[in-house]
Structure formats: C-alpha cells, structure tokens
Amino acid sequence: MTDQGLEGSNPVDLSKHPSGIVPTLQNIVSTVNLDCKLDLKAIALQARNAEYNPKRFAAVIMRIREPKTTALIFASGKMVCTGAKSEDFSKMAARKYARIVQKLGFPAKFKDFKIQNIVGSCDVKFPIRLEGLAYSHAAFSSYEPELFPGLIYRMKVPKIVLLIFVSGKIVITGAKMRDETYKAFENIYPVLSEFRKIQQ
C-alpha cells in the first residue's frame, strides 16, 4: 500500500509537487452497491458494531477499527464508506463491511465501488492575506469572515473546492482522484505565495 503524503518520510517528487508540499489525505468517501435488499433491523440486532435509529436516519451506521471507518448501509443495498485515509484503505474497509453483511445471511456482492470524494489538507507555513486574495480572485472566491473564518475557493480545473485559512492551512475537497487534489494545490500555491502576509 502506497500511503504518500507522510511529511518528511520520503523525498518529495518535485516534478509532481513543484511546491515541495504534498497534501495529506484526511478522508475518503466511497460508495458500493451490495446489490441485494437488506433488512436493516436484522443487521442492527445481529452486528456488534452497528446502530440503527430509523426515526433519525434511514440507514444502519456501522463502524470498524481497522481501517478506522464508518459505513452507512441502506435497505436498497447501497453503502457509503467514510473515514479512510487512502483509496486502498477505503476499498479494504468497504469489502470488510460487505463481508459482515454476508455473514449475517444476505447475498451481498461488491458492485460499482467508486471513490466519491477525497479530502486532503496541508500547511504552506506562512500566513495569507485573504482579503486581497478574495478581491483579486472574486470570480472563484467567497470570503465572509463573520460567517466562516476561511476563504472558499472554487477552482474550475480541476473542479475542486479549497478552504484557505489565514494561518496558511489549506483543506482541499471534491476530488475523485488524488492527483486532482495535488494538481489543485499546485495551481493555488503561486496565488497563496502572491498573497503571503509579510510579518512586521
């Protein structure tokens, strides 16, 4: 399993990450179709790590420790898996949930596994003038500090949303492939450098 993005562990490939910074993957959201109807009440009663409160939410919420994830399992057989730190771990976790459902007596399959969202983050290690950035990139930016402390930057290519904080911390969301996360960060990095706050 390649788990890139551990700062300081290997030298950064500057051809792919010219900024010298590799965003760390924080959360992967994936979906899969178990391709059979499920009795959620029966699953909740038999599985140790499951909760089901149909008045609150129409899915069983199941958790496993390894990889540390949460699954939402719907009566239609659709499942959402969140919390994994890499695509491989997300798929591994989804397979484990499918196996748990199989062991409870349902003919669960593993169809159409798909990564739906990758959330990454990084720290450029310098403060950013968000007002200036918002003003000069008004078409892509929304910045209302009294509502939310970060600037929301909607990049068109790749179609990614970045949350940019004055501290230099960046959250990158909306990618379906990790390379989009990396590309979006490399696209924004020169802009962040341009609006670097000069320390007095």
From Swiss-Prot:
Positions of the sequence repeats? 25-101, 115-192
Tell me where it resides.
Answer: Nucleus
Give a Pfam family name: TBP
Q: Which UniProt keywords apply?
A: Acetylation, Activator, DNA-binding, Nucleus, Repeat, Transcription, Transcription regulation
Q: What is its main location?
A: nucleus
Q: Which residues carry this modification: N-acetylthreonine?
A: T2
| Origin superkingdom | Eukaryota
Q: Name one GO biological process term.
A: DNA-templated transcription initiation
* Molecular-function GO terms, alphabetical: DNA binding
SUPFAM superfamilies, from UniProt? Answer: TATA-box binding protein-like
User: Which GO terms of the cellular component aspect does the record hold?
Assistant: nucleus
Task of the protein: General transcription factor that functions at the core of the DNA-binding multiprotein factor TFIID. Binding of TFIID to the TATA box is the initial transcriptional step of the pre-initiation complex (PIC), playing a role in the activation of eukaryotic genes transcribed by RNA polymerase II.
- HAMAP family to which the protein is assigned, alphabetical: TATA_bind_prot_arch
| Family to which this protein belongs | Belongs to the TBP family.
Subunit structure comment from the entry: Belongs to the TFIID complex together with the TBP-associated factors (TAFs). Binds DNA as monomer. Interacts with TAF1 (via N-terminus). Interacts with MEE12/CCG1. Associates with PWP2 in the nucleus. Component of a nuclear protein complex containing at least TATA binding proteins (TBPs, e.g. TBP1 and TBP2) and ATX1.
Name of this protein: TATA-box-binding protein 1
Q: Which organism is it from?
A: Arabidopsis thaliana
